[in-house]
Amino acid sequence: MGIHGLAKLIADHAPSAIKEHEIKSYFGRKIAIDASMCIYQFLIAVRQDGNVLQNEDGETTSHLMGMFYRTIRMLESGIKPVYVFDGKPPQLKSGELEKRVERRAEAEKLLAQAQEAGEQENIDKFSKRLVKVTKQHNEECKKLLSLMGVPYIEAPCEAEASCAALVKAGKVYATATEDMDGLTFGTTVLLRHLTASEAKKLPIQEFHFSRILQDMELTHQQFIDLCILLGCDYCGTIKGIGPKRAIDLIKQHGSIEEILENIDPNKHPAPEDWLYKEARGLFLEPEVVDGTSVDLKWNEPDEDGLIQFMCAEKQFSEDRIRNGCKKITKSRQGSTQGRLDTFFTVTGSISSKRKEPETKGSAKKKQKTSATPGKFKKGK
């Protein structure tokens, strides 16, 4: 779900923190990608006659086609992607997960009604609401990435939190996701639309966290409290407090505790047993991969393995998969040239509270840590 209305709030109150770029602007960048969000996008977008792609055995293949071709597109643009998969959800998320089950049940009813009435537009709409990323989808995508030579990480908990940890450790430039809570977890740079379909022609939106805090005149903890007021996955919100009122209250009182002391509980009741402190703790100190010990490697594709998996097992066209392998190999030859700016700073590792550039010594130190074996690293 992410954070309700946060992107618009940032656009209204900190527009200079958002930049728009084409994909070619990220040549030479290492980017951590929220894998579950990508797979969900592929299951919705990669369709034929309104249905997910399937092979002759009735197995869904939309996620594999999307992952294969969108990853190749990034590699051809000189990007080094690392996919981060969700681990176990935090206990606080159980309420949100229950709501999702209820919404799915409602969508199933509406889909049945639309099918009975022959309403194709509603059939498409409610079919997409029933899309769910399964463990099998995840495992098949991990296998595909390994065969493509692209690294992936299994996060201990929320993928966006571990993406942010990789950014803060200087291992990657940015977190790529459509969920804005990557910023709440403290990623210094967040990218939206990186994995969107080329046909949509959406520019990539780049959000800079330090500039957001600066322009909104908030600390990181105040920003987290703002996100909780807007609505997150971990707890409810105060009734009748919209985005504009939320930011005004945070600026006026500085914290949720002070806001609760100063608003009328009859007009604006807080949820019973409101777990906002626990939600704040999850954002401030999430369970994440150890970013400093992760060793990311991008390898040559295993062409024979890809043909066996994608063609023999999943029934993709052999010509297309071999052509994709050639593109991956060619992209590796072109991506050996680095970005000029990476010779001077470790991009993406600057704290949101710091404005001065890092010293050359710290950059060398960061470069040395990349040789340390990573506990969660799965690229092969």
From Swiss-Prot:
Locations listed in the record: Nucleus, Nucleolus; Nucleus, Nucleoplasm; Mitochondrion
GO BP, sorted A to Z: base-excision repair; DNA replication, removal of RNA primer; retina development in camera-type eye
Post-translational modification: Phosphorylated. Phosphorylation upon DNA damage induces relocalization to the nuclear plasma.
Example of a GO MF term: manganese ion binding
Residues annotated to bind Mg(2+) 1: D34, D86, E158, E160
Keyword Lipid biosynthesis on entry: no
Region annotated N-domain, chain positions: 1-104
Pfam family for this entry, one: XPG_I
Record carries keyword Cytoplasm: no
EC number: 3.1.-.-
Cofactor dependency: Mg(2+)
InterPro entries assigned to the protein according to its UniProt record, in alphabetical order: 5-3_exonuclease_C_sf, Flap_endonuc, HhH2, PIN-like_dom_sf, XPG-I_dom, XPG/Rad2, XPG_CS, XPG_DNA_repair_N
One GO CC term on file: mitochondrion
PROSITE patterns per the UniProt record, alphabetical: XPG_1, XPG_2
Quaternary structure note: Interacts with PCNA. Three molecules of fen1 bind to one PCNA trimer with each molecule binding to one PCNA monomer. PCNA stimulates the nuclease activity without altering cleavage specificity.
Family: Belongs to the XPG/RAD2 endonuclease family. FEN1 subfamily.
Stated name of the protein: Flap endonuclease 1
Provenance organism: Danio rerio
Biological classification of the source: Eukaryota, Metazoa, Chordata, Craniata, Vertebrata
